[in-house]
């Protein structure tokens, strides 16, 4: 039976996810939310979504599955908003946040006791590119798509999500939300701090050593590439996993 999928956030992740869902489920209706008119237009023109809105609450009651592909702070705010809306019975809400413990905690607090299912998730894929214009149906291929089950997640719900996302060609795995945040602090968040710190330090160094920029080559680019990522998004990620990241910094010392 055809379903209605609502993707809130039509950036690189959300738009690429829409393409993947369309690949295996062309009969599903995909609704999209984004504040940017340009992003909505691109998603519609490329056939990623069927309808678009800049009013988040307007499409939520129509959806069988709602996926929040937004910055962490906004994801949390929208989970709180969804708790007060008249949603379909048994609707699945999921997210794509880079940290999980805070999101899962809010979901369990606000969605408990309702006919709502929640599945925390983090697709371990991305790029320094951003926006719907950079969407790629193969973005998630062979990448880990991590689910962080909670008290609001049943085995049947997990299976439904895996079927829905089959067109992403990702590798699904399940892990506790807090353990997810500990592991990603080491292999994702802390490396980003190192890359950004190296870029900042090099900029100051180059003020007195003019050949610095000219000599910086492959090794330097490899180490600092991730520092190009969108700073607002990374500020949200780092602040939401602050204590665990501070532990990694202490370990590094």
Tell what function each PLM region has.
Residues 208-253:
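Interdomain hinge/lid region at the active-site interface
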Residues 80-133:
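Rossmann-like NAD(P)(H) cofactor-binding subdomain of soluble oxidoreductases
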Residues 57-87, 91-92, 98:
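Rossmann-like NAD(P)-binding element
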